[in-house]
């Protein structure tokens, strides 16, 4: 409810402009009222965990990504994971994998849910699966990118792609064949 934008989307669209910095400062003021903040969107996580520091902004709250938060809960036996019965593969969000080096946290949860296989191009070598923002001006390209990633998953025998990025999830869902 009271979550101002991190500045990640503006940074993507217009770079480190004054509007972007102002958005980041407004977000930082709210984040610093908390002890710990769980960040759901990988792009926001990179903005908050890395870019704020690069800009000299002081973050006092501990910031953890959603996959890392879930993995911590799972390791502490505070979270159980139901078995899926299918074959799963994890779609590494490039922002978590490349920018933050976070690739294993989500796998701890996915591996506990069932049989897991790895797509070619995983972890830091991940292949992008789409972007909500970019689909506004190049929908055909984003649809193709997502469709290609679905093919990658099928080629390794996966029937389910698990995503940590809402943006990639939306792109994959839109590109998925009916049924």
Please tell me what each predicted stretch does:
Residues 1-179:
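Iron-sulfur cluster-binding electron-transfer modules in prokaryotic oxidoreductases
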């Amino acid at each position: 409810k009271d979550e101002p934008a991190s500045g990640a989307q503006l940074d993507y669209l217009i770079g480190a402009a004054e509007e972007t910095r102002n958005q980041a400062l407004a977000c930082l003021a709210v984040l610093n009222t908390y002890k710990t903040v769980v960040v759901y969107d990988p792009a926001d996580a990179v903005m908050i965990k890395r870019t704020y520091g690069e800009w000299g902004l002081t973050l006092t709250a501990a910031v953890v990504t959603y996959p890392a938060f879930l993995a911590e809960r799972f390791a502490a036996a505070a979270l159980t994971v139901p078995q899926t019965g299918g074959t799963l593969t994890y779609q590494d969000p490039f922002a978590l994998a490349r920018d933050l080096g976070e690739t294993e946290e989500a796998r701890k949860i996915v591996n506990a849910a069932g049989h897991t296989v790895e797509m070619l191009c995983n972890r830091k070598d991940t292949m992008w699966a789409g972007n909500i923002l970019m689909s506004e001006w190049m929908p055909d390209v984003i649809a193709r990118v997502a469709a290609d990633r679905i093919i990658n998953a099928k080629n390794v025998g996966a029937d389910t792609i698990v995503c940590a990025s809402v943006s990639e999830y939306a792109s994959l869902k839109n590109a998925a064949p009916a049924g």
